[in-house]
Swiss-Prot record:
This is Putative nickel-responsive regulator. InterPro entries: Acetolactate_synth/TF_NikR_C (IPR027271), ACT-like_dom_sf (IPR045865), Arc_rbn_hlx_hlx (IPR013321), CopG (IPR002145), CopG/NikR_regulator (IPR050192), Ni_resp_reg_NikR (IPR022988), Ribbon_hlx_hlx (IPR010985), TF_NikR_Ni-bd_C (IPR014864). It comes from Syntrophus aciditrophicus (strain SB). GO terms for biological process: response to nickel cation. Belongs to the transcriptional regulatory CopG/NikR family. It comes from the Bacteria. Its cofactor is Ni(2+). Transmembrane segments: none annotated. Ni(2+) binds at H78, H89, H91, C97.
């Protein structure tokens, strides 16, 4: 017996047309998979607001010539060693580096780490990509 449950959804025709364009743009094969992904996305956001264990990646680009920048990055990473699982350093060109920090733990702590790294003088861009730890179906 399947665990799949079918249910009906009533939508305004204009909203349905917009949703169908969204499905086409994202290459979904059907509405059901798009709805499942949207539900998962909202449940994931909820995990991040309820202090459940989460995972994610912090990415940032910085000018490695910036005075004392690397020491500040290392100090911050050591301050948050309990949530950092891995880091990857990539040389983009002569001046710019990309760093990817894989994280797992408390969402508040991870957000503080992300904000601290992005606030360092010389960091040109940074973002936090959120995910869960596999609890959402």
């Amino acid at each position: 017996m399947s665990d799949i449950v079918r249910f009906g959804v009533s939508l305004d025709n204009t909203l349905l047309k917009q949703f169908d364009r969204f499905i086409k743009d994202r290459n979904y094969t059907n509405r059901s998979e798009a709805i499942r992904d949207l539900i998962r996305q909202e449940l994931l956001k909820k995990e991040w607001t309820e202090d459940q264990e989460v995972a994610g990646a912090i990415t940032y680009i910085y000018d490695h010539h910036q005075r004392d920048l690397l020491n500040k990055i290392i100090d911050i990473q050591h301050d948050f060693h309990d949530v950092i699982k891995s880091t990857q350093h990539i040389h983009l060109d002569h001046d710019n580096c990309l760093e990817i920090v894989a994280v797992k733990g408390n969402p508040t702590t991870i957000s503080k780490l992300s904000n601290a790294l992005k606030a360092i003088k010389g960091v040109r861009h940074g973002s936090l990509s959120i995910s869960g730890v596999g609890q959402i179906a």
